[in-house]
Amino acid sequence: MAVSRATKVSAASNMMSGIPGAPKRVSFANIREPLEVPDLLDLQVQSFEWLVGDETWFQRRVDAGDENPVGGLEEVLSEISPIEDFSGSMSLSFSDPRFDEVKASVEECKDKDMTYAAPLFVTAEFTNHTTGEIKSQTVFMGDFPVMTDKGTFIINGTERVVVSQLVRSPGVYFDQSVDKTTDKDVYSVKIIPSRGAWLEFDVDKRDTVGVRIDRKRRQPVTVLLKALGWTAEAIRERFGFSETLMATLEKDHTAGQDEALLDIYRKLRPGEPPTKESAQTLLENLFFKEKRYDLARVGRYKVNKKLGLDLPFESGVLTEEDIVTTIEYLVRLHAGEAEMPDRGQGGDATIPVEVDDIDHFGNRRLRTVGELIQNQVRVGLSRMERVVRERMTTQDVEAITPQTLINIRPVVAAIKEFFGTSQLSQFMDQTNPIAGLTHKRRLSALGPGGLSRERAGMEVRDVHPSHYGRMCPIETPEGPNIGLIGSLATFARVNPFGFIETPYRKVVDGRVTDQIDYLTADEEDRFVKAQANTPIDDEGNFLADRVLGRRKGGEVELLAPTEIDYMDVSPRQMVSAATAMIPFLEHDDANRALMGANMQRQAVPLLRSEAPLVGTGMELRAAVDAGDVVTAEKAGVIEELCADYITVMADDGTRRTYRLQKFSRSNHGTCTNQKPIVNEGDRVEAGQVIADGPCTQNGEMALGKNLRVAIMPWEGHNYEDAIILSQRLVQDDVLTSIHIEEHEVDARDTKLGAEEITRDIPNVSEDVLADLDERGIIRIGAEVQGGDILVGKVTPKGETELTPEERLLRAIFGEKAREVRDTSLKVPHGETGKVIGVRVFNREDDDELPPGVNELVRVYVAQKRKIQDGDKLAGRHGNKGVIGKILPAEDMPFTEDGTPVDIILNTHGVPRRMNIGQILETHLGWIASQGWSIDGDPEWAKRLPEELYDVDPGTNTASPVFDGAREEEITGLLASTKPNRDGERMVKANGKAQLFDGRSGEPYPYPVAVGYMYILKLSHLVDDKIHARSTGPYSMITQQPLGGKAQFGGQRFGEMECWAMQAYGAAYTLQELLTIKSDDVVGRVKVYEAIVKGENIPEPGIPESFKVLLKELQSLCLNVEVLSSDGAAIEMRDGDDEDLERAAANLGINLSRNESPSVDDVVQ
């Protein structure tokens, strides 16, 4: 390819541009990107800026040519204003929303379970129209949650994300379907508003045009036209060209406007007496009044565009012209015409007549954070409007002020309800930084006003050509939500109407320019686009005579360069941020790439992060934009630093101290820790990373570890995706992670008295309390395990009749002898760790606590989890597996120089899954770890820049998606790797090495692929899953053990397991499993007694579930009873209940033990 080497150098360094102080990473990219990746949080941040009418947003809109930009809150206040009383003599209007300073910092809000919010004030103006008096006041409208710099909200101390929603845009949609009986094409159209009644027209199989108003019964369309004041002559004049409409007019027997109105009223309000006035009002209110009907700006834009009208965007109601033009479009569509006159432009202009594709991104828009919150504020204000109206009529006119009319409760409640309970306000995924970043860029078709999982069909879930560059075709969940939840593409942005735009380079007369145009999906359909990897020279001219171009609907064909209108800006334009971090994505099957993109979000932060040897160049941008690293705001010099803070003296003389997060718990129990990566006296530039966060190294995303991998079977121990690991990874803490759990207990006021946090706990030995301080709270640094007391607490017991002795004690010692029970906070069953923090909140110290709570204690327990059998590991290509065996390092296969491999993966995991990217990554990983030097100027190295001819060992590389290292380059580089100290190359040019069995020292018969692969430790840890039970809680009705680890349940012995037992003839074992080990209540106790006393196990009794079955049959009036040989009914009793109770009491067993709310109670 004739690309000059100079161009290539700029392409390699371009990946890192924009962020100063970036670590070295040599790139194999060949394409120069004319545009940097935009800020990945813009989707959230800019939308919220629009809502609050921020200065930066205002300036951005003015620069874009918007003369009078209006913020979201201002827009909704002007919609509701003025609120008039029923007589119209008084009105109240709102304007000028503004915020005060936030009440507390983000850290304080997280600490104290507060909401990060700012007080909202508006100017309210009350006007008395009879006297002309105007009273104006500034009114407090409640605390309004504010977005943090990272694009999240802190609600009651937890970090949440509001997900953007993909919905059908308001507008007019034409549809075509086939009638089942006649096989004729049937056409229909819906006018869908943002709020209000739907209006639907259709042409049925009898070729008559009908209308449905607000989804009620169908009637001829001419009835609606007559109701709007059209005469039969006017209809003939406008629609004379359409036989269908003329036939409909003939069949319509309504005479004049009045009769048509009454006809419509009867259909909409059956059972109510129709009058002309009420019918007229009803129709006007449905479609022509702003209070009841709103197309919204976007709906008006879509209607104008589709029907060729030229009405102002502010007109949110339907007009007569809208309805008439829609009917004309429908009948022309039915008649098979391809175009119709453009009534907006006039003259000879025409618009195409075609049906709409509802899954096209020109017809689906995003409701971003700002709009979702704005809708809730609108709901709250409309509830408040009712209150204001009532107060206007009831209060004394003289005494009325805006403050007395307004009740802000509905507004505050609506906002609170949205953030607390809406399906779109989600608990932020904080497993690692990429999980949080992806969560903020997520697009969901679910939620209020969207689709539901059950109703969504294949079409809406499928990848659509219009997704290109807008929504990632790869990153979506597996399971019921597939295709309904997506991720915004890397370069995409959202326009003011909510449509997603993607950038293209303009092509003029076959020459590619650096002019960037952002196009929406329907604008893009008019042009022909070329791929980003189309070869061009330094001037931007296409090198080939024929260029592959993409037309409407995703069709591709070879075209002359002059036919091309636009060109992609980047090869990674079509994928999301997470997918763009998979090297050699182009060599992976889509299903596996999907798993790879999703599993990166599940990687737990390791003790020591390590950036990938083989990356894509996206690591730095993703880490910086995710916001878990600390960046310098201004250029300057590091004045002072320690583990907890960094002080920068800026060039302008200002001093700024950055506080670092130390070992705090994330939403998902992983450890968040920031550490400085600069030294005192270092010079830093604005935007430079000065401290690493979790899963980052030198400011780059670092989710896993580079491990030396051999791809081979090993004694069957890595069969079916199992993984064999070296003991070295356990000893050296290579894959060790820290997990922090939060345990909390509160002391409340109960009916019997106040609970107390204390060290004085009844019936507990002193050695159990050894680690508690004098308050009864565990000391920091204590090692704890399941069942240990973290916080001592006692609760008053219910009073019983006192014996004379107790009364005497009470008289002598006062309240002290009162009965209390132990309700201490204990470590849950199966958990261990070290106490790293304790927080105490007390009402006496003026801490805000919920009503009835006097004291709240939080204990943080950290666990260091080494890698072990059963943990799940994965690569970035969907190659996941569970550790099957951990071998001593000396037993692992080793190369000729004696170095053992770290991990063995099975060869069978590659061919049928078609994720070959992992093999190329392994080879390039080896090349990067050894370094390389290219001799001469071989053919395969023609596209490599100068800086890639000689690279040191251990240099990080970047192989960007769709523009990475090629197969012939990897083959050439394998032969060019630098030799080790003995002058030997362990891995040959074919990427394989001679390995030796670590146990015998014998060489393996065939060479094995060896290299470095980036391996992630996923959050599916065996410690969280392993579970065992001896006795525990039972279900109330069936008396069978509960299920699941959270309930401390048993293992289900189901239908198929019973069949297996029957097949083996193991009758007694089966009987035991179904009775005394499960729900034979009496038998359980007797068996326990027999085991304790060393006796033989007695006969099983009747299972409780059998009794339940009998009761259910009795409820169906079927009497089931057991008869003796002489036909007498036998009562099913389980022997002597008194003996049973006595035995249970002696053994200390509680027979009435039913479901308990949590495992903690079970363990207690």
Curated annotation (Swiss-Prot):
InterPro entries: DNA-dir_RNA_pol_bsu_ext_1_sf, DNA-dir_RNA_pol_bsu_external_1, DNA-dir_RNA_pol_su2, DNA-dir_RNAP_su2_dom, DNA-dir_RNAP_su2_hyb_sf, RNA_pol_bsu_bac, RNA_pol_bsu_CS, RNA_pol_bsu_protrusion. GO terms for molecular function: DNA binding; DNA-directed RNA polymerase activity; ribonucleoside binding. The keyword Nucleotidyltransferase applies. One of its GO terms (cellular component) is DNA-directed RNA polymerase complex. SUPFAM superfamilies: beta and beta-prime subunits of DNA dependent RNA-polymerase. GO terms for biological process: DNA-templated transcription. Its EC number is 2.7.7.6. It catalyses: RNA(n) + a ribonucleoside 5'-triphosphate = RNA(n+1) + diphosphate. Keywords: DNA-directed RNA polymerase, Nucleotidyltransferase, Transcription, Transferase. The keyword rRNA-binding does not apply. It is an enzyme of class 2 (transferase). It holds the Pfam family RNA_pol_Rpb2_7. PANTHER family: DNA-DIRECTED RNA POLYMERASE I SUBUNIT 2 (PTHR20856). DNA-dependent RNA polymerase catalyzes the transcription of DNA into RNA using the four ribonucleoside triphosphates as substrates. Belongs to the RNA polymerase beta chain family. The RNAP catalytic core consists of 2 alpha, 1 beta, 1 beta' and 1 omega subunit. When a sigma factor is associated with the core the holoenzyme is formed, which can initiate transcription. This is DNA-directed RNA polymerase subunit beta. The gene is rpoB.
